[in-house]
Amino acid sequence: MKKILFVASECVPFIKTGGLADVCGALPKEFDKNYWDVRVVIPDYSCIPEQYRNNFEYVTHFYMSSGPYVQDKYVGVLKYEQDGVTYYFIDNQEFFTGFSPYTSDTKFEIEKYTFFDKAVLSMLPLIDFKPDIIPVSYTHLTLPT
């Protein structure tokens, strides 16, 4: 069975500001579950509706450096399953709290999504998932490949 991990900044039905969320919400469901183990990871934004947040399942947490001269930061990993797809959420109150997933502060956005990218890669051994394919969606998600 091949494994795919979609990495995105937003995904329907959890959070949507544009077309990326629609694609990320629809595409993973279309894979034949007999041949593909498809999972999605997005940030755990505080603005995700409570109807979903209340059903997120705690998986694990760890602390991670987000750069030199910076204290290690908390990374929580939550999970939710729907329509045969497993969704993971990267939790960090410093970066993902607010009324919207994005801000107008470019420096903060760069730091936030650099942190997210590193957290995604760091969580993989902890959830025992080694993807064969990692499609990254959007310019600020620049996982090293």
For each feature predicted by the language model, list its residue ranges:
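Active-site catalytic microenvironments for nucleophilic, acid-base chemistry
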Residues: E30-N34, M123-L126, T142
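A conserved catalytic-core segment of Leloir-type glycosyltransferases
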Residues: D44-I127
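N-terminal subdomain of nucleotide-sugar transferases
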Residues: M1-K79
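Conserved acidic residues
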Residues: D132
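Short, hydrophobic/amphipathic alpha-helical packing segments
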Residues: C24, P28, T114-L121, L141
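Conserved small/polar residues in nucleotide/adenosyl-binding loops
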Residues: T139-T145
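Short, flexible helix-adjacent loops and helix caps
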Residues: K16, D128-F129
